């Protein structure tokens, strides 16, 4: 990819600055929130137990607080996911990344998959991103899952958790075709490089979930303004 094509993309507003290392302490949350505010990322994504702290850190800021629900397997009950979602919203989350129940999808329990997402969308009244774990779905299952999540009211389809491999360009292209622009596409898992992130956006993604956002911004700044000062290196890494 050329330098010109990289710098044509406004990267920061597409990024969910993800902190999903279970060993990440509160200091990391504060750091991630400060970075997200500084660079105007779309959101900071943290575990539910750290939503309240992230909300305090980003009070009055434009960056949203996102969290994961039923993560990473989706193999909890619909009522448990709903409780987790509503508690997260009470603590300040304004975006929810919700893992669907893969077993239910694969054994044809489409009503259960639909209802679980629909209830969270209706009762939480915040942006819901449904995680599909695309790498373990057949083409027919993927198409079915997309339609169920659109009908349920989700605002985004998210490619996966990272527990079953990373996102691919081909998957994002498939989702672009399947969604027909009716819903956003969040590409996540294994996105560590600026060029790959830009390629995913070009393929149809509208959000990028990554914990490597600062490294990407350094690459972006170097491509756009080679002689200008880059984001600082003195940061903790998870």
Residue spans for each PLM region:
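Conserved N-terminal beta1-alpha1 strand-loop-helix module at the mouth
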Residues: 1-91, 144, 148
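Generic structural signal for well-ordered alpha-helices
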Residues: 29, 33, 51-52, 85-86, ...
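Short, well-ordered coil/turn segments that N-cap beta-strands
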Residues: 40-42, 61-65, 92-94, 124-128, ...
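Alpha-helix-loop-beta-strand connector modules within alpha/beta enzyme cores
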Residues: 48, 52-73, 110-136, 166-193, ...
């Amino acid at each position: 990819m050329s330098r010109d094509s990289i710098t044509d993309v406004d990267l920061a507003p597409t990024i969910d600055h993800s902190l999903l290392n279970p060993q990440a302490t509160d200091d990391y949350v504060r750091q991630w929130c400060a970075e997200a505010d500084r660079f105007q990322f779309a959101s900071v994504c943290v575990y539910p137990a750290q939503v309240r702290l992230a909300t305090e850190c980003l009070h009055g800021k434009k960056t949203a607080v996102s969290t994961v629900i039923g993560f990473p397997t989706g193999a909890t009950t619909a009522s448990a996911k709903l409780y987790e979602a509503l508690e997260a919203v009470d603590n300040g989350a304004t975006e929810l990344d919700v893992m669907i129940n893969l077993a239910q999808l694969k054994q044809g329990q489409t009503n259960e998959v639909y209802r679980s997402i629909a209830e969270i969308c209706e009762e939480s009244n915040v942006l819901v991103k449904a995680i599909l774990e695309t790498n373990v779905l057949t083409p027919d299952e993927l198409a079915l899952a997309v339609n169920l999540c659109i009908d349920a009211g989700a605002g985004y389809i998210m490619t996966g958790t990272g527990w079953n491999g990373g996102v691919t360009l081909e998957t994002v292209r498939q989702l672009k075709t399947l969604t027909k622009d009716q819903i956003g596409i969040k590409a996540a898992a294994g996105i560590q490089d600026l060029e790959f992130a830009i390629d995913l956006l070009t393929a149809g993604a509208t959000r990028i979930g990554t914990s490597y956002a600062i490294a990407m911004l350094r690459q972006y700044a170097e491509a756009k303004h080679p002689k200008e000062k880059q984001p600082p290196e003195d940061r903790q890494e998870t």
